[in-house]
Amino acid sequence: MPSPTNPAKVETPFTTAALGNGVDFWKAYVENRPHPSDSFFELISEYHHSHGDSAAQSAIAHDVGTGPGNIAEKLLRHFDHVVGSDVNEQALAAAPALLPADSIKRMTFVKSSAEDLASANIPESVGKGQTDLILVSECIPLLDISKAFAAFRALLRPGGTLAIYFYSRPIFTGDNEAELNQLYDRIATRVCQFLLPFKGTPGFPIHYRAAEAMSSGLDSIPFDPEAWQDVVRYKWNADVPLTFNSKEGYDFEVEPVDRRDHSTEITKEITDRDFWAEEWDIGRVASFLDSVFPNYRNKAGDKFEEVQSLFTELETALGGPKATRKVSFPVVLLLATRK
């Protein structure tokens, strides 16, 4: 057993493996993750301006889990100033190298977990009670929801907006799409298995929480009606699970959970294979998986050849090393107004 002076290392999904990486890693991360469309952020802005009170609605936004600030920068089109927070100091340090200098002038970066934001060292003018919109980009499954939501309420002004979104695996379209999607799933599931064990480790509660949130399409995330109102849940391409790999990638069982308030919340499901559509070749698939599962190649060791063989199958099914195919994604967006 670990001693009190030498506690067990807690490995969490993505976060632990991403620590210590510099500008090159984060540049590749930005390039190889999906790129949310301008219309997606316009939808968030439209909700924001049509709910809550109208005072100072476009002054301050805060991007939680900002990484190197690429999504935070997109918010500058809609807000005067954007705060970006993250637990990863190296990710924050990469922002000036990856973003335009004129954007950096209108941004503030803060090292903090989401759960600790209420006590973080955020300048008063852009901190507690001053924030018009909080955007939680792709990190919500990792968070302690009750603690994080309490921190978000502390930052938001009354009538401010909380926007949470999450995307998962690529969905291949067109000819032989079933074959392509099955091959992707086999690859991603084997990659996830290289990271085992999860169960019985200090980080297991976070692994379980993340798996539950993803397998539930974020329906496991509740909004307290005493604290939030006008909750809307958008679900694009919900016919595909909001997970990066199948359940066989885990060493524990997880089932979907629905904690929605069906009497007050609105859920909108949209099937649209052109949503966030991009053209991907085999290299882009491999780079995407590198960004989702950092360091998996080292964890795989000699077994990496199993994945290489599957990549070869997928490359052939795509039509060759340079052949591309349109992909879309399952995406969930949660919107709520602070009471």
Curated annotation (Swiss-Prot):
InterPro entries: Diverse_substrate_MTase, Methyltransf_12, SAM-dependent_MTases_sf. Keywords: Methyltransferase, S-adenosyl-L-methionine, Transferase. The keyword Lyase does not apply. Induction: The cluster is expressed in rice fermentation medium. Three regulators are located in the cluster (ptaR1, ptaR2 and ptaR3), suggesting that the production of pestheic acid is controlled by a complex regulatory mechanism. SUPFAM superfamilies: S-adenosyl-L-methionine-dependent methyltransferases. Pathway: Secondary metabolite biosynthesis. This is Methyltransferase ptaI. The gene is ptaI.
